[in-house]
């Protein structure tokens, strides 16, 4: 493992390590309290994790359509949980605790574009958002607000589609197959103005402001990097879920590779390196950026036509594979303890069907990530292909972040790590690995 870490350092585009990354941003989804069984997470189970975290981001608040006010997505839970969470500062006085808005948890089928509506709103309506945010934050003892706005996403690439002539401009190179927001330039300017107004109000109240760039939200469309970065205390890039079984049901590939693999018509922006470099090349200080790592994996259902090797890109997949027994996700999401329980542990054990273990394939190059698979049987059933970052690969990414001169790592999120120690007996193995290799 140590040899592999030194190896990847040689692949970095920097020549020296000038500092130790210091930020470890820990996301906590309050919905984890509502889960059943072993997936249910209580606030007292955060204590062990918070000795490693510099910031805790509590998710998620929402944006009220019409009035555009910040509001709790679960009043019955949050009316108690908000203050329980901020009270953790008594045990961890150096911990900064922020409330995140959006984060793909603010589901509003009647107003799916309400975050764009906030950008387009007049100054009075935007002030409702600012004022309501300050009231909610101050009333409950939060240190600041994290903007995880649910903005329009890149369209997924077309299966077997041609990339044409590699597009006619850099912007098209970064957008995927289609432009989904023809008013993107206007929205970029509006977002910059809104953030400036929020920052001005927060500054007088001594409140922090951070940005989370959600997966597949196009930075070239919405973020004027040179103007934006001075307004934020830090910026978290959720550099994962580039491909998922929901977005890409007919082909499976690495969900969060570090580097671009120039094969099989992959899109060149679907990797960590491209996302980080875009912000750095647009004059964002590295210390403002935190690399986002997922503590979960994504699972596709394999067909007989998907073959036996599992080497990505895997074709003829059939969308989402069944979730694990703890999270029970309908989106092909498996937490780390769910993943490790599916990997082969006992070579002598004989299981068939859905109980048969998955065979893990480790990426010896440490560039793209690990995967595991169970080919479909003769009837085309029980096939699974799973992409994930295990504790070792999360450590590799921590080393990468140090080498790029970034501020640190953002872990999405604590409730998907093995907070009960079910895999090996050690609790929070992904978080621990990140902290160890950050130094």
Curated annotation (Swiss-Prot):
This protein's gene is called: Idgf1
Record bears the keyword Signal: yes
What CDD domains does this protein map onto? GH18_IDGF (cd02873)
The protein's name: Chitinase-like protein Idgf1
Reported effect of changing residue 399 to E? In strain: MB34a and MB39b
List the Gene3D superfamilies: 3.10.50.10, Glycosidases (3.20.20.80)
Q: Which organism is it from?
A: Drosophila melanogaster (Fruit fly)
Another remark in the UniProt entry says: Lacks the typical Glu active site in position 150 that is replaced by a Gln residue, preventing the hydrolase activity. Its precise function remains unclear.
One matching Pfam family? Glyco_hydro_18
């Amino acid at each position: 493992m140590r040899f592999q870490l030194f190896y990847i350092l040689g692949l970095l585009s920097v020549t020296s390590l000038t500092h130790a990354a210091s930020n470890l941003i820990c996301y906590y989804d309050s919905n984890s309290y509502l889960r059943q069984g072993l997936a249910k997470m209580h606030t007292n189970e955060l204590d062990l994790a918070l000795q490693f975290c510099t910031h805790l981001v509590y998710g998620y608040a929402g944006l009220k359509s019409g009035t555009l006010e910040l509001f709790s997505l679960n009043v019955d839970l949050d009316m108690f949980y908000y203050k329980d969470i901020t009270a953790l500062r008594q045990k961890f006085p150096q911990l900064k605790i922020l409330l995140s808005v959006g984060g793909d948890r603010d589901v509003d089928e009647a107003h799916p574009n309400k975050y764009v509506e906030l950008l387009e709103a007049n100054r009075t309506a935007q002030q409702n958002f600012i004022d309501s945010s300050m009231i909610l934050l101050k009333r409950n003892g939060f240190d600041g607000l994290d903007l995880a706005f649910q903005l329009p996403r890149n369209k997924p690439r077309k299966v077997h589609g041609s990339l044409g002539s590699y597009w006619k401009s850099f912007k098209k190179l970064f957008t995927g197959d289609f432009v989904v927001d023809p008013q993107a330039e206007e929205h970029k300017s509006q977002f910059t103005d809104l953030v400036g107004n929020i920052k001005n109000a927060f500054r007088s109240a001594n409140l922090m402001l951070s940005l989370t760039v959600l997966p597949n939200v196009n930075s070239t469309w919405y973020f004027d990097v040179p103007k934006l970065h001075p307004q934020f205390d830090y910026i978290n890039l959720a550099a994962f879920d580039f491909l998922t079984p929901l977005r890409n049901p007919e082909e499976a590939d690495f969900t969060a590779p570090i580097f671009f693999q120039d094969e099989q018509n992959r899109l060149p922006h679907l990797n960590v390196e491209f996302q980080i470099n875009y912000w750095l090349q647009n004059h964002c200080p590295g210390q403002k950026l935190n690399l986002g790592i997922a503590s979960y994996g994504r699972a596709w259902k394999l067909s007989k036509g998907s073959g036996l090797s599992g080497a990505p890109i895997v074709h003829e997949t059939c969308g989402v594979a069944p979730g694990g027994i703890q999270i029970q996700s309908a989106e092909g999401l498996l937490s780390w303890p769910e993943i490790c329980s599916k990997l082969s542990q006992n070579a002598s054990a004989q299981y068939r069907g859905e109980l048969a273990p998955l065979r893990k394939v480790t990426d010896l190059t440490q560039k793209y990530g690990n995967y595991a698979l169970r080919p479909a049987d003769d009837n085309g059933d029980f096939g699974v292909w799973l992409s994930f970052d295990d504790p070792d690969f999360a450590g590799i990414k921590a080393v990468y972040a140090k080498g790029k001169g970034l501020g640190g790592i953002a872990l999405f999120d604590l409730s998907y790590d093995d907070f009960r120690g079910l895999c090996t007996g050690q609790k929070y193995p992904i978080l621990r690995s990140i902290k160890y290799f950050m130094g």
